[in-house]
Regions:
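Extracytoplasmic gate region of multi-pass secondary transporters
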Residues: 43-45, 264-315, 319, 375-380, ...
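Cytoplasmic membrane-interface "Motif A"-like loop-to-helix N-cap segments
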Residues: 107-119, 326-340
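Cytoplasmic helix-loop-helix junction between adjacent transmembrane helices
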Residues: 144-187
Length: 495
């Protein structure tokens, strides 16, 4: 008598060959960018160790300096906040500048080779920062130079993984899929914090070396297993533009095809919004553990562990933003609402968040969700929507450039945030939070035009009783042959 089909084989047969490959790509790109973010996080955990309160520690008998013996030069000066901010900005400015160039290379080079080289270099430069501990290096230029090269190497990651995802997944439920997928940012931050926290008090060099080795190994795995296009393994390519009207007016398409990507409708607004949203997110990324140490008076490891709750909230916020934007067809509106709600809650966290461990946990999770939700949505679903725009005529490689433009502009904010925090924090942490609140409000204002258009479309759909042609999440992205060109060369609409 034959036995029934083995459960494992039944599971394998339950999904198509295309589904298994898509699952592999989703998992692999998730792990790839998790490693990128994991390798960025240790500096925020180690900051409190580079300049700590020596009076709370037991001083060695052979050390006569009772006030600065535990500092790590060159961060033993009174302007240590500015020096640490400068180290952050060396990475972030290089990242912002390199991001605009990275998209161009990403279009022309095989993503598998490009990612492998970038991850290997990122691992080397991350480890070199930690080796400064073992080599007893106390020159500021060394750490700044390592951060610059690391920032340039890290620009290989984001355009590549978003392009790969865009090649494999269509627009259906893109916000939900990418909301889950984009949790790699927060998962990487959490892992980076926990790994760095293991050695921060004993040998902080390992806080950098271990993540550096991990990202290099992951680069090797991506070299062997990453598939850039579904066609490379005889899988069915996704349908990106089934929702869009087929245009008979070649003039409209020709106009868009020959315009710089920055003038594609929505790119400018979302880029500027991301600039301020990322300013807030990266200020928390690089300065939250030190804020907790200074205000709540936790140890370095405890502050690092507590700061991971902000990223836990980021995972929740990214998924919620994706689900809501898919359901409402309103990417811009979803982002704007979350940003506006985040502003007063940031003020509340600074005011009462450190009164007790319970209030701190709750506020960190909520603030993390509201701050990182819009950031996650813009850098994933919105970038993919714009990069697979109908006017690009299926040019999937353009997705790398569009993604680089949006994330590169956002990275300018990522560089400004930690720099401003380093300059402002000596005047009081309250002023830092006022800066963050103002940035959230400005981010929302840049989306106001798109929000207005989305609301008009929703009202029109309500009058008609159905969705307008299965409209995309932002209907202004779609080229409609019935819309004449305006004075600026853009399709006019009376919506």
């Amino acid at each position: 008598m034959r036995s029934s089909l083995a459960p494992g084989i039944w599971l394998l047969r339950a999904f198509s060959r295309d589904s298994w490959y898509r699952g592999l790509i989703l998992l692999l790109t998730f792990l790839i960018y998790t490693c990128y973010h994991m390798s960025r996080k240790p500096i925020s955990i180690v900051k409190s160790q580079l300049h700590q309160n020596c009076s709370e520690l037991e001083r060695p008998d052979n050390n006569s300096n009772s006030t600065t013996w535990c500092y790590w030069a060159p961060f033993d000066q009174d302007n240590y906040s500015q020096l640490l901010g400068g180290v952050d900005d060396a990475f972030l400015i290089a990242y912002a500048v390199g991001m605009f160039i990275s998209g161009i290379f990403g279009e022309r080079l095989p993503l598998r080779y490009y990612l492998f080289a970038g991850m290997l270099l990122s691992g080397i430069f991350t480890s070199l920062f930690g080796l400064g501990y073992y080599w007893n290096i106390h020159q500021l230029w060394y750490y700044v130079l390592v951060q610059i090269f690391n920032g340039l190497a890290q620009t290989t990651g984001w355009p590549s993984v978003v392009t790969c995802i865009g090649n494999w997944f269509g627009k259906g439920k893109r916000g939900f899929i990418m909301g889950i997928w984009n949790s790699h940012t927060s998962v990487g931050n959490i892992l980076g914090s926990l790994i760095a926290g293991i050695w921060v008090d004993s040998a902080w060099g390992l806080s950098f070396i271990v993540p550096g080795v991990v990202i290099a190994v992951m680069g090797l795995i991506s070299f062997f297993f990453l598939v850039e296009y579904p066609e490379d393994v005889n899988c069915t390519p996704p349908q990106h533009h089934s929702w869009c009207l087929e245009s008979s007016d070649e003039g409209v398409l020709w106009h868009y095809l020959h315009c710089p990507f920055i003038f594609l409708q929505g790119v400018m607004e979302f880029s500027l919004c991301l600039l301020f949203a990322k300013l807030v997110s990266y200020t928390f990324l690089f300065w939250l553990p030190l804020y907790i140490v200074n205000v709540a008076h936790f140890g370095s490891k405890e502050a690092g562990d507590l700061s991971t709750l902000f990223d836990v909230g980021g995972i929740i916020g990214g998924i919620l933003a994706g689900i809501i934007s898919d359901y409402t067809n309103g990417r811009a509106t979803t982002c704007c609402v979350m940003l506006i709600v985040a502003a007063p809650l940031l003020f509340l966290y600074n005011s009462v968040g450190q009164n007790g461990i319970s209030s701190s946990i709750v506020m960190l999770i909520i603030c993390g969700a509201l701050v990182n939700g819009p950031y996650a949505l813009i850098t994933t679903a919105v970038s993919a929507d714009l990069g697979t725009h109908k006017s690009l005529r299926g040019n999937a490689k353009a997705l790398s450039t569009v993604t680089a433009i949006i994330d590169g502009t956002g990275s300018i904010g990522a560089a400004l945030g930690p720099l401003l925090a380093g300059l402002i924090s000596p005047t009081g942490w309250n002023n830092v939070f006022y800066m963050l609140i103002s940035s959230d409000v400005l981010a929302c204002l840049f989306l106001s035009r798109l929000v207005y258009k989305e609301i008009q479309v929703l009202e029109l759909e309500g009058l008609l009783g159905h969705s307008i042609l299965g409209a995309p999440p932002n209907p202004t992205f779609c080229v409609n042959h019935s819309l004449p060109l305006g004075a600026a060369g853009e399709p006019e609409t009376n919506l």
